[in-house]
């Protein structure tokens, strides 16, 4: 089946698809607080989703392209779930968030199919994959159209990987008690086995969102990157997120001695946002298998246990948390009680001495991850490093922070 035909088949109207903002039905929705964060973007009046321009641009999307798609959504006269929120158009049609971003992705997919230069074609496929992922954002469970966009993103990503520098292998990992999961091993040029970073992504992202991290920061240092999806999304959708948040990554880590391209004696973990919860758990539970753990904007304690902090978090992010935990109909109070159990301090891990070297990067006044969480991580490590990243200029400092973090990882792996 051709890629174009796959698009037509997946998105063929069959029934009235649920609109994304209605999928999580918490009872006491509050007023939307204004929020701005380097890793998560910012809340903009009249939008349900947080608009994450920095990360989308970092992944290769032109700022003008973002504005063009937003404009098409804003200008739509189609029926909305909430007339006050632009991105709540019902059904797969003009103005619907998933429709508009997927339509934009198809433009690049078509360019990729007609481009004769393999490397340029690979770039176009990667661009399409990123746009399909934005279409599926924030990846709530039960969002049928978003899941179809994710399937197209994965297909486009596989096409891109065949044409871009280095080698990518799609790998299947067995997890006892449930379905196997699929990961992507990205390898630089040269002969393996390679020192490897196990990527632990945020809850509102897919594993295919981190190619820029590999290409710009790890590959030039001769380091491979292994990604898997977080529980309940993408290739890990059959697994629910539980208090044992590192379960899937742990099984992958244990399987690495059997992967010939990976030097299993030189492995680090890198966690973005809630992925840091996974990475820090691994630092405690699998310290003999890890040379280092790095975190960026970690969600390990405060957001999970502090009611005031939770009140400052946008509606969409609370919906993401509820969706991952399988609590689609929960009140905020029930969600709060459950989230507290995910705190690594409440679990009795953070605060205890950990032999694994740990670095944690943070931004001042980050609504998702206060400085205290990063201090808790680094002070718990026998070899801890705290890294403050200034907010402005946001893109340049984000790049500088990642350079420093990957340099720190390289010293411990190579």
Curated annotation (Swiss-Prot):
Highest taxon in the source lineage: Bacteria
Family that this chain belongs to: Belongs to the FrsA family.
EC number, as in UniProt: 3.1.1.1
Name of this chain's protein: Esterase FrsA
InterPro entries: AB_hydrolase_fold, FrsA, FrsA-like, FrsA_esterase
Function: Catalyzes the hydrolysis of esters.
Gene3D superfamilies found in the cross-reference section: alpha/beta hydrolase
Catalytic activity: a carboxylic ester + H2O = an alcohol + a carboxylate + H(+)
Protein's UniProt keywords contain Hydrolase: yes
Keyword terms: Hydrolase, Serine esterase
A molecular-function term among this protein's GO annotations: carboxylesterase activity
């Amino acid at each position: 089946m051709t890629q174009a035909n796959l698009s037509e088949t997946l998105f063929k109207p069959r029934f009235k698809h649920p609109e994304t903002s209605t999928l999580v039905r918490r009872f006491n929705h509050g007023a939307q607080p204004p929020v701005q964060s380097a890793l998560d973007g910012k809340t903009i009046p009249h939008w349900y989703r947080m608009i994450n321009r920095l990360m989308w641009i970092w992944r290769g999307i032109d700022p003008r392209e973002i504005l063009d798609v937003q404009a098409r959504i804003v200008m739509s006269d189609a029926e909305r779930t909430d007339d006050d929120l632009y991105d709540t158009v019902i059904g797969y049609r003009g103005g619907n968030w998933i429709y508009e971003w997927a339509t934009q992705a198809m433009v690049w997919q078509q360019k990729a199919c007609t481009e004769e230069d393999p490397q340029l074609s690979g770039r176009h496929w990667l661009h399409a994959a990123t746009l399909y992922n934005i279409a599926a954002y924030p990846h709530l469970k039960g969002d049928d159209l978003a899941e179809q966009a994710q399937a197209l993103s994965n297909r486009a990503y596989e096409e891109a990987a065949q044409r871009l520098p280095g080698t990518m292998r799609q790998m299947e990992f067995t997890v006892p008690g449930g379905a196997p999961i699929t990961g992507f091993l990205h390898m630089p040029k040269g002969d393996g086995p390679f020192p490897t970073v196990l990527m632990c992504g945020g809850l509102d992202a897919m594993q295919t969102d981190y190619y820029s991290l590999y290409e710009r920061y790890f590959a030039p240092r001769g380091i491979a990157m292994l990604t898997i999806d977080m529980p309940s999304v993408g290739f890990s959708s059959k697994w629910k997120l539980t208090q044992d948040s590192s379960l899937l990554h742990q099984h992958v880590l244990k399987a690495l001695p059997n992967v010939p391209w990976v030097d299993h004696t030189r492995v680090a973990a890198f966690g973005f946002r809630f992925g840091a919860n996974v990475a820090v758990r691994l630092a405690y539970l699998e310290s003999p298998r890890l040379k280092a753990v790095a975190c960026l904007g970690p969600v390990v304690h405060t957001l999970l246990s502090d009611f005031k902090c939770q009140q400052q978090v946008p509606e969409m992010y609370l919906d993401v948390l509820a969706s991952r935990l399988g609590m689609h109909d929960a009140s905020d109070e029930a969600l709060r009680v459950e989230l507290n159990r995910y705190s690594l301090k409440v679990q009795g891990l953070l605060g205890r001495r950990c032999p694994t070297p740990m670095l944690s990067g943070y931004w001042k006044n980050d609504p998702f991850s206060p400085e205290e969480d990063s201090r808790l991580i680094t002070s718990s490590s026998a070899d801890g490093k705290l890294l403050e990243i200034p907010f402005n200029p946001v893109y340049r400092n984000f790049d500088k922070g990642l350079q420093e973090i990957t340099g720190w990882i390289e010293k411990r792996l190579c």
